[in-house]
């Protein structure tokens, strides 16, 4: 079991990371419920691509999580591939696993937690399961998704 002081340190790190532009943990019991198994960081595709300084956040977290590695399996979901490739050595050195739930379906290994919800409907997964709130309102994510779908359709119709 992880020492209480280390738990507190990790919680402070998470709160500090939230100020760097990633998620804010609302539920202080998060570590109590997950400390025997894993900590999961969810970076939905659109916020990670447009709003979150992913590299800065991960470097900040990795500095702290080297000492936590024996106690946690740290997983990142939905990290855009370009960030994962650039940060592969950093992630490996801290035993951080990277899972992209969109590409994982190709080999049939969909993460069990994510499979509880439809993988395209990100809002209930991120908002309810982990009680995480993002600084970017969810409505903006919907606007971006609609915009990109419209863009793809319009490009397709132009070529046909």
From Swiss-Prot:
Transmembrane segments: 39-59, 136-156
Note: Completely overlaps YBL113C.
Topological category with respect to the lipid bilayer: Multi-pass membrane protein
Compartments it resides in: Membrane
Keywords on record: Membrane, Transmembrane, Transmembrane helix
Annotated family: Belongs to the UPF0479 family.
Protein name: Putative UPF0479 protein YBL113W-A
Main location: membrane
A GO CC term assigned to this protein in UniProt: membrane
